[in-house]
Amino acid sequence: MSDLGAVISLLLWGRQLFALYSGNDVTDISDDRFPKPPEIANGYVEHLFRYQCKNYYRLRTEGDGVYTLNDKKQWINKAVGDKLPECEAVCGKPKNPANPVQRILGGHLDAKGSFPWQAKMVSHHNLTTGATLINEQWLLTTAKNLFLNHSENATAKDIAPTLTLYVGKKQLVEIEKVVLHPNYHQVDIGLIKLKQKVLVNERVMPICLPSKNYAEVGRVGYVSGWGQSDNFKLTDHLKYVMLPVADQYDCITHYEGSTCPKWKAPKSPVGVQPILNEHTFCVGMSKYQEDTCYGDAGSAFAVHDLEEDTWYAAGILSFDKSCAVAEYGVYVKVTSIQHWVQKTIAEN
């Protein structure tokens, strides 16, 4: 409950008011700073308090967060009794969101913390990739990222100690475990659990998981990362680019020659075939020929829902080898893996 604060609300209907709660402190209000409320005819003073959360957290409760002292000296909420609320992290609400006039291959620098869900993962051979914070203790990345410099026989227990992970402004966080998707050869996804919850703030914030499909053809999303830039060197600065969702038929034809299994043949212009199936969608290049590149995998295709003013992870970048040479990057649909994600988090 460390993120839970409480303040007193006063109603001139109750008994004698004796204390003011603020944060984790209880202050006696019998002195001059907090004078006793004046009495009113045919009425009384009732004392109660209301829980509130710190910045970047919100109250989760079936009640209203207001607790009243009953005759047994118990603090009770009308809806939930003595059950306390929780403060959960806000997701998808960056303080300084990216906007369309700002424009990682040739992308613009993220100087304002527009992508607080973006994490940086480094393998034991110093290869940099991306990961995406989805709550205070869990991140999504690709299975390929987790297996970098490991044999196919490596287990999740073998992999976890070899990874270094940073969130926010180079904040090192410790990894407790990694969990690979049971069908990771076809669904290129894995989860990372941290040993401790991160403190959510302006620089560190999860992105929301979608309740609907945002991977519609033509929809524009933002992708951030530390991948190779236009000089094919890894960047020390987080960059981002705006990219449109592409037609799946065109994407499959580009990489496999045909959507018909009978006529499919490898024809990737970069010599590596992406995983293309019902769990993926494709994204094209920007009008400036900007694209993702090596090292950006694991980053989110972040979509801004204007009606809700909330950012959602529509996809996780799996194939980051297009580098403005191939026409399409390939992403794992978050809606396709969401049940597995929620189940895995609940069980771990």
From Swiss-Prot:
Gene Ontology CC, one term: extracellular region
Tissue: In adult liver the amount of HPR mRNA is at the lower limit of detection, therefore the extent of its expression is at most less than 1000-fold that of the HP1F gene. No HPR mRNA can be detected in fetal liver. Expressed in Hep-G2 and leukemia MOLT-4 cell lines.
InterPro entries in alphabetical order: Haptoglobin (IPR008292), Peptidase_S1_PA (IPR009003), Peptidase_S1_PA_chymotrypsin (IPR043504), Peptidase_S1A (IPR001314), Sushi/SCR/CCP_sf (IPR035976), Trypsin_dom (IPR001254)
Record-linked CDD domains: Tryp_SPc
Signal peptide as annotated in the record: 1-18
Domain Peptidase S1: 104-346
The record's note on its domains: The uncleaved signal sequence interacts with HDL fluid lipids and mediates incorporation into the HDL particle.
The family this protein is said to belong to: Belongs to the peptidase S1 family.
Protein name (record): Haptoglobin-related protein
Species, as recorded: Homo sapiens (Human)
